[in-house]
């Protein structure tokens, strides 16, 4: 029987790029609490002892950006100079500009050539869903996220007191080529920052027993499964001291772990007038409902936009041969049941809420949090009825 391997990775909330993402989204949420129609493109850089806040923000909100950055760093767990990064001692610089009026006139309703709310930029976005896990996400990325979430949980509750905030996970699965479904886990990689007083053997055993085994389905682990725990042997220096972190540099971790294409636009720090974020969320919503409705076992949707224009320039669906009805019919159903204009997406998914901080670590998709409206499957009955299923 033919098999193939596929790998996805995740990173913890203490990874420097994720620190940057979380600061950007914390600032976005703080602004949306006071001004839900603000235009926000908040970028963050973190390095040893330094945080730089830059980008474009147009708002009536009165927000203490520097305070929010420090509070976010503290919540993540960088609260001691021994960790190489400390919310108290790091320098924070805020250098925001306002949104360009040339862009604003294309996005604001009643302005520009298209009087509807236009897209904030050109671009292409993808949504994806499959039946590999209960949340209709690919197996490797779903469980890679759960591993680093578990690492953070055990770090914060003190069960493994030598854990530090920075961590990465990676899962390689063996897939059945005939069914396209995962059969077993081939390799698990977990690297976690740690205090200098823990030896590698003790750390490795604890990580496998307390982090890896409670998370991964036991039926997917075989005697041949390889566990690579801190394979360099030491990971004391980490976080922003180990690497410079930037907003938007973990776009594959944020989405489908490489199982679906990515249009290239990052999410964190962007208000929902930016289709990089809102249309990617809508794409997930569409794809998940199509799979949940049984129209296909796998669904990938691409949407594209032109700056200042409300209607998408294209909508394409690929079901990889798993469809129960023709793809052309699925595209018709998408156009009928989902409003993919920027304003339509914002209303459909209620995106003007301060809900983005929670998205900034452990994946934007496949987490059935109450705020994550794009994970709802409330279009299933309508889709099935129109599809004749």
UniProtKB/Swiss-Prot annotation:
<feature type="binding site" description="in other chain">
    <location>
        <begin position="234"/>
        <end position="235"/>
    </location>
    <ligand>
        <name>ATP</name>
    </ligand>
</feature>
<feature type="binding site">
    <location>
        <position position="270"/>
    </location>
    <ligand>
        <name>ATP</name>
    </ligand>
</feature>
<feature type="binding site">
    <location>
        <position position="266"/>
    </location>
    <ligand>
        <name>ATP</name>
    </ligand>
</feature>
<keyword id="KW-0479">Metal-binding</keyword>
<dbReference type="GO" id="GO:0005524">
    <property type="term" value="F:ATP binding"/>
</dbReference>
<keyword id="KW-0808">Transferase</keyword>
<feature type="binding site" description="in other chain">
    <location>
        <position position="274"/>
    </location>
    <ligand>
        <name>L-methionine</name>
    </ligand>
</feature>
<dbReference type="GO" id="GO:0006556">
    <property type="term" value="P:S-adenosylmethionine biosynthetic process"/>
</dbReference>
<keyword id="KW-0067">ATP-binding</keyword>
<feature type="binding site">
    <location>
        <position position="243"/>
    </location>
    <ligand>
        <name>L-methionine</name>
    </ligand>
</feature>
<dbReference type="GO" id="GO:0000287">
    <property type="term" value="F:magnesium ion binding"/>
</dbReference>
<keyword id="KW-0547">Nucleotide-binding</keyword>
<feature type="binding site" description="in other chain">
    <location>
        <position position="99"/>
    </location>
    <ligand>
        <name>L-methionine</name>
    </ligand>
</feature>
<dbReference type="InterPro" id="IPR022631">
    <property type="entry name" value="ADOMET_SYNTHASE_CS"/>
</dbReference>
<feature type="binding site" description="in other chain">
    <location>
        <begin position="166"/>
        <end position="168"/>
    </location>
    <ligand>
        <name>ATP</name>
    </ligand>
</feature>
<keyword id="KW-0554">One-carbon metabolism</keyword>
<dbReference type="GO" id="GO:0006730">
    <property type="term" value="P:one-carbon metabolic process"/>
</dbReference>
<dbReference type="InterPro" id="IPR022636">
    <property type="entry name" value="S-AdoMet_synthetase_sfam"/>
</dbReference>
<comment type="function">
    <text>Catalyzes the formation of S-adenosylmethionine (AdoMet) from methionine and ATP. The overall synthetic reaction is composed of two sequential steps, AdoMet formation and the subsequent tripolyphosphate hydrolysis which occurs prior to release of AdoMet from the enzyme.</text>
</comment>
<dbReference type="InterPro" id="IPR022629">
    <property type="entry name" value="S-AdoMet_synt_central"/>
</dbReference>
<comment type="subunit">
    <text>Homotetramer; dimer of dimers.</text>
</comment>
<dbReference type="InterPro" id="IPR002133">
    <property type="entry name" value="S-AdoMet_synthetase"/>
</dbReference>
<feature type="region of interest" description="Flexible loop">
    <location>
        <begin position="99"/>
        <end position="109"/>
    </location>
</feature>
<feature type="binding site" description="in other chain">
    <location>
        <begin position="249"/>
        <end position="250"/>
    </location>
    <ligand>
        <name>ATP</name>
    </ligand>
</feature>
<keyword id="KW-0460">Magnesium</keyword>
<dbReference type="GO" id="GO:0004478">
    <property type="term" value="F:methionine adenosyltransferase activity"/>
</dbReference>
<keyword id="KW-0630">Potassium</keyword>
<dbReference type="InterPro" id="IPR022630">
    <property type="entry name" value="S-AdoMet_synt_C"/>
</dbReference>
<feature type="binding site">
    <location>
        <position position="43"/>
    </location>
    <ligand>
        <name>K(+)</name>
    </ligand>
</feature>
<protein>
    <recommendedName>
        <fullName>S-adenosylmethionine synthase</fullName>
        <ecNumber>2.5.1.6</ecNumber>
    </recommendedName>
</protein>
<feature type="binding site">
    <location>
        <position position="243"/>
    </location>
    <ligand>
        <name>ATP</name>
    </ligand>
</feature>
<dbReference type="Pfam" id="PF00438">
    <property type="entry name" value="S-AdoMet_synt_N"/>
</dbReference>
<feature type="binding site">
    <location>
        <position position="17"/>
    </location>
    <ligand>
        <name>Mg(2+)</name>
    </ligand>
</feature>
<dbReference type="GO" id="GO:0005737">
    <property type="term" value="C:cytoplasm"/>
</dbReference>
<feature type="binding site" description="in other chain">
    <location>
        <position position="56"/>
    </location>
    <ligand>
        <name>L-methionine</name>
    </ligand>
</feature>
<comment type="pathway">
    <text>Amino-acid biosynthesis; S-adenosyl-L-methionine biosynthesis; S-adenosyl-L-methionine from L-methionine: step 1/1.</text>
</comment>
<dbReference type="Pfam" id="PF02773">
    <property type="entry name" value="S-AdoMet_synt_C"/>
</dbReference>
<feature type="binding site" description="in other chain">
    <location>
        <position position="15"/>
    </location>
    <ligand>
        <name>ATP</name>
    </ligand>
</feature>
<keyword id="KW-0963">Cytoplasm</keyword>
<comment type="similarity">
    <text>Belongs to the AdoMet synthase family.</text>
</comment>
<dbReference type="InterPro" id="IPR022628">
    <property type="entry name" value="S-AdoMet_synt_N"/>
</dbReference>
<dbReference type="Pfam" id="PF02772">
    <property type="entry name" value="S-AdoMet_synt_M"/>
</dbReference>
């Amino acid at each position: 029987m033919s098999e193939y391997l596929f790998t996805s990775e995740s990173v913890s909330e203490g990874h420097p790029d994720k620190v940057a993402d979380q600061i950007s989204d914390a600032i976005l949420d703080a602004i949306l609490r006071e001004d839900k129609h603000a235009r926000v493109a908040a970028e963050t850089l973190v390095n040893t002892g330094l945080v730089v806040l830059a980008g474009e923000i147009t708002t009536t909100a009165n927000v203490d950006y520097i305070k929010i950055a420090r509070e976010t760093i503290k919540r993540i767990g960088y609260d001691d100079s021994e960790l190489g990064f400390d919310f108290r001692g790091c320098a924070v610089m805020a250098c925001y500009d306002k949104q360009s009026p040339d862009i604003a006139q294309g996005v604001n309703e009643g302005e520009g050539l298209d009087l509807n709310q236009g897209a904030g930029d050109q671009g292409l976005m993808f949504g994806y869903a499959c039946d590999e896990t209960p949340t209709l996400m690919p197996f490797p990325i779903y469980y890679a996220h759960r591993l680093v979430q578990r690492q953070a949980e055990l770090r914060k509750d003190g069960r493994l007191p030598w854990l530090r905030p920075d961590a990465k996970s990676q899962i390689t699965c063996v897939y059945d080529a005939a069914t396209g479904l995962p059969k077993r886990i081939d390799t698990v990689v977990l690297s976690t920052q740690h205090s200098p007083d823990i030896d590698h053997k003790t750390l490795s055993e604890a990580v496998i027993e307390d982090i890896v085994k409670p998370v991964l389905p036991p039926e997917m682990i075989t005697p041949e499964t390889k566990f690579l725990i801190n394979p360099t042997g030491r990971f004391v220096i980490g976080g922003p001291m180990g690497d410079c972190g930037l907003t938007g540099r973990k776009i594959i971790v944020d989405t489908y772990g490489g199982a679906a294409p990515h249009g290239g636009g990052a999410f964190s720090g962007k208000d929902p007038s930016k289709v990089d974020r809102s249309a990617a969320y809508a794409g997930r919503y569409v794809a998940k409902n199509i799979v949940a409705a049984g129209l296909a076992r796998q669904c990938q949707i691409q949407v594209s936009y032109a700056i200042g224009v409300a209607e998408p320039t294209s909508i394409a669906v690929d079901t990889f041969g798993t469809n129960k009805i023709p793809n052309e019919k699925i595209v018709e159903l998408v156009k009928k049941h989902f409003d993919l204009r920027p304003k339509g997406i914002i209303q459909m998914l209620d995106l003007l809420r301060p809900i983005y901080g929670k998205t900034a670590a452990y994946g934007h998709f496949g987490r059935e949090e109450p705020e994550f409206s794009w994970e709802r499957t409330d279009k299933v009955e309508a889709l099935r009825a129109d599809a004749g299923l």
